[in-house]
Amino acid sequence: MEKALVLRFLAGVYYIKDLETQIILEAKKRGKLKTLVIKTTQKENSSASDFIIKVGDIVLYELSCDTYLIQSILPRKNELKRPNVANIDQVLLVFSLVKPNFQFLLLDKFLLILEQQKLDVVLVFSKIDLLEPENFKTMQQQLSYYQKFQHFYYINSKQKIGIDALKHIFANQITVLAGQTGVGKSTLLKVLIPDAQLKTQEISESLGRGKHTTKNAQLYDFNGGFIVDTPGFSKLDLTTFSPRTLKNFYPDFLEHVCDCFFGESCFHLQEEKCGVKKALENGQILPSRYQNYVIFCEEIKNQPKY
């Protein structure tokens, strides 16, 4: 059997790229995967998602009766469920500064979930041309806090501002484009890969939210690596977190745990002599960052299983 990379799934057909010949083929899934040997760094037990072929999967296939059949999925190093992608090197997290308006709450929630997945993140802030200079300067000052643990870029895709500085990050990487609906992911991809034939859509003025442009995850060759364009989404949940573990996915909080009286057992909420709260008072932690942490704690506690 031969190895291939899954580029796209559409109407029951998998578009795969043979790793040796680099030829793109149309294939179908075998009725029941013959050899399921999936293990990821994120889990040990099998789940229903193990039986779903994802964009980014490395698969074994063979020709049978004039049809290419995917027989098995090779081990994944990581995976996401929404978007449904596997074997990711990094996530390019795109936010617009306006239309839709930027939310620190959404940024912190995305970062929290991706930190749990142990994925490298690059932040991209789009539509910088739609902000007044003073407002843009204020946003830059607020967002500068995140520079100590994230790489990020400011861009204007339509005028191609900041695009050249961004291109190098894609080399030899599988990069997922992710972010809220309508932030400009498809516009950015169209600038990077003009022949991707994507349809960009205007923001719905009445709802203040974007219309979905990308219907299925798809992997594109670019600059020696691959870019995965994914459907936009605006709802994220914290069902994989517990009140006890949430704090462990804040790298900026972990810097101050050594100053907590209760050490790693501190929840950084009501406890006295808390190093994180002291850092907050001293201006070392962004107030909105801590406030969002408290909101997430409450959200998790109010989930049915808790």
UniProtKB/Swiss-Prot annotation:
GO cellular component: cytoplasm
Cofactor: how and how many bound: Binds 1 zinc ion per subunit.
The keyword Chaperone is assigned to this record: no
Keywords: Cytoplasm, GTP-binding, Hydrolase, Metal-binding, Nucleotide-binding, Ribosome biogenesis, RNA-binding, rRNA-binding, Zinc
One BP term from GO: ribosomal small subunit biogenesis
Residues holding Zn(2+): 260, 266, 268, 274
Gene Ontology molecular functions: GTP binding; GTPase activity; metal ion binding; rRNA binding
Known cofactor(s): Zn(2+)
Class of enzymatic activity (EC top level): hydrolase
Superkingdom to which the source organism belongs: Bacteria
Keyword Transcription regulation: no
Similarity comment text for this entry: Belongs to the TRAFAC class YlqF/YawG GTPase family. RsgA subfamily.
NCBIfam families: ribosome small subunit-dependent GTPase A (TIGR00157)
Descriptive protein name: Small ribosomal subunit biogenesis GTPase RsgA
Organism classification: Bacteria, Bacillati, Mycoplasmatota, Mollicutes, Acholeplasmatales
